[in-house]
Amino acid sequence: MLQGIRILAMAVTGLCAVNLLYSQSNETKQNSADLLRTFKTIYVQSKTPLAKPQILAGELQKNASFDAWGLSITSNPGADVVVEIDHQPGWFYYTYAMTHQSSSIVLAVGRVNAWDGKQASARIAREIMKRVARVRNPPTQH
């Protein structure tokens, strides 16, 4: 009798553990499309003095969809996403990466060719907004 109770208790404990693991994995399963659809705040940082964060922030805000999607630039490094700009000295290209903070999922990454940080910021802003538009304004099916 005692052996049967122990087996039953172990079975119940095992089922509870499996249920807990399953519920946690469903909650944490996020993909880049879901994150691109739902983020609201953006923090911009630059690893180069050639491209100021304020210039990229301004270029992002120029896009008509920026306000329509309810996006905001913040000076808080704890924003939903961080956009980081860098420049390779001696070359005319700038790299960027947009990362979702809480999940560490990279949402966009790329490189643009530009003579200076202002031109690079404009091109990076266009690339980022195109990436977001693919999930927020999907093409209609006919």
Language-model features: locations:
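Solvent-exposed beta-strand motifs enriched in subsets of small alpha/beta binding domains
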Residues: 45-46, 84
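Bacterial N-terminal signal peptides
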Residues: 9-19
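Short secondary-structure boundary/capping segments within folded domains
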Residues: 34, 72-75, 88
